[in-house]
């Protein structure tokens, strides 16, 4: 019989790797001061007396056909997951406190129409029941547990045999194999590994809810994100009603799709037309406002960008960018000053994407730089005009992907004109649309048409 013994390891809180001795700098990820001491209960290594586990030919698995995903009943969630939850997959759902992680996890359950074990060490069973009642969820397929011991939870899974296990949250669960408090890097890694093994061996899907740090990353070792199959982030400012579900990692689908939701008394509600949501309160006839068709995955979303340029009367000029990359804003200001002769070095500059959105799509460049010029010159951009295009350092307007979808969404919302890169028009069929499509090759050409 294998003897249990305790060994000392040093675990990196950044990358999750363990080492036999302490170092000031992690040998794996090169971070400083991230190694902490942990006691691990292990069994002495002995040779297995049983027969080795058999292997499977890949061709035999392919002949079985496509594995069916389990639809959640929420199209926005299924879109981000790539078509639903794959049996035996492990999903990590992160987000800031109060953003709606637990609410979303509960709302997924009814659509699965399967037995689900919901484990919450943060709320009592009565509190969970009240939350489910508020969301209109009433099913005898849902089993609740407030256990926080990983071994006991695994025993509950073996007894109930659910199709889905929800852990809320991984930071509150501990394993007897690690001599440390719940939420420590060692505990998170050990518990994550145990639930991952169970998931793959039994075909049980697992949704792990994780807290995020003030830097916006999931708390705990990075190894947890490497373990799981899918990493989802639910984003949104608590001051606003809308939420955005993004995929940072997905072994079984794309990471480009997003799901848009709106928080209400009934929980998270899908937004079928995000463009109308983000343009609903747009102020008319004001300089510094422009609209562009962002492409999130395969879905175009019209978003308003606002810019404010004013004289810096209090020393060093301020630069503030919400929703876009700060370094990209600096590039736009340099292009305006160098290529168009606009003095921006003595100006306070503020840029904001309405609704608290965060966009990395470079096709927003033309709208942002035009909004900056509009505010600086105090000239209004026509309300029926949309701009799209990437801006280069020499002031050229470069092509963007999937222009046809962007134009179709723009036309559907009643806009009369869209300004696009000239290079895109070579492959674009104007006969398919009634909206005016104007091609430009430089920022200077855009300004001559608008200002």
Regions found by a protein language model. Name each.
Residues 116-120:
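Conserved RecA-like ASCE P-loop NTPase motor core of nucleic-acid helicases/translocases
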Residues 144-145:
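Conserved SAM-binding strand-loop segment of SAM-dependent methyltransferases
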Residues 2-14, 18-81, 86-92, 99-115, ...:
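Peripheral, non-AAA+ core regions of ATP-driven protein-machinery
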Residues 96, 121:
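P-loop (Walker A) phosphate-binding loop of NTP-binding proteins
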Residues 124:
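Conserved Rossmann-like nucleotide-cofactor binding loop
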């Amino acid at each position: 019989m294998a003897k249990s013994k305790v060994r000392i390891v040093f675990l990196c809180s950044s990358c999750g790797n363990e080492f036999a001795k302490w170092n000031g700098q992690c040998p794996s990820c090169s971070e400083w001061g991230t190694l902490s001491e942990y006691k691990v209960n292990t069994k002495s290594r002995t040779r297995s007396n049983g027969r080795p586990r058999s292997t499977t030919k890949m061709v035999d698995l392919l002949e079985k056909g496509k594995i069916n995903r389990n639809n959640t009943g929420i199209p926005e969630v299924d879109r981000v997951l790539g078509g639903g939850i794959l049996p035996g997959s492990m999903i990590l759902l992160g987000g800031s406190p109060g953003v709606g992680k637990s609410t979303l996890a509960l709302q997924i359950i009814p659509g699965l129409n399967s037995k689900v074990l919901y484990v919450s060490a943060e709320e009592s069973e009565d509190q969970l029941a009240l939350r489910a009642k508020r969301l209109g969820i009433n099913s005898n397929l849902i089993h609740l547990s407030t256990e926080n011991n990983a071994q006991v939870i695994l025993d509950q899974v073996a007894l109930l045999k659910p199709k889905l296990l929800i852990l809320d949250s991984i930071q509150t669960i501990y394993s007897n194999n690690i001599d440390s408090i719940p939420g420590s890097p060692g505990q998170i890694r050990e518990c994550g590994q145990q639930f991952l093994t169970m998931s793959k061996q039994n075909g049980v899907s697992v949704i792990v809810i994780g807290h995020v740090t003030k830097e916006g990353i999931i708390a705990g070792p990075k190894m947890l994100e490497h373990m799981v199959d899918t990493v989802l982030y639910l984003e949104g400012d608590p001051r606003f009603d809308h939420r955005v579900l993004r995929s940072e990692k997905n072994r079984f689908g794309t990471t480009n799709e997003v799901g848009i939701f709106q928080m209400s008394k009934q929980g998270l509600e899908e937004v079928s037309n995000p463009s109308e949501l983000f343009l609903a309160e747009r102020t008319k006839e004001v300089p510094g406002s422009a609209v562009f068709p962002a492409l999130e995955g395969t879905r175009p979303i019209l978003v308003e960008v606002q810019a404010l340029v004013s004289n810096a009367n209090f020393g060093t000029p301020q630069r503030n960018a919400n929703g876009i990359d700060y370094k990209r804003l600096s590039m736009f200001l340099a292009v305006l000053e160098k290529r168009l002769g606009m003095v921006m070095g003595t100006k306070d500059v503020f840029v904001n994407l309405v609704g608290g959105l965060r966009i990395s799509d470079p096709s927003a460049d033309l709208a942002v730089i035009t909004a900056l010029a509009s505010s600086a010159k105090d000239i209004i951009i026509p309300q029926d005009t949309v701009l799209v295009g990437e801006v280069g350092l020499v002031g050229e307007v470069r092509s963007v992907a999937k222009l046809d979808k962007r134009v179709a969404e723009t036309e559907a919302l009643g806009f009369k004109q869209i300004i696009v890169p000239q290079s895109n028009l070579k492959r674009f069929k104007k006969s398919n649309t009634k909206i005016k499509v104007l091609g430009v090759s430089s920022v200077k050409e855009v300004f001559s048409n608008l200002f």
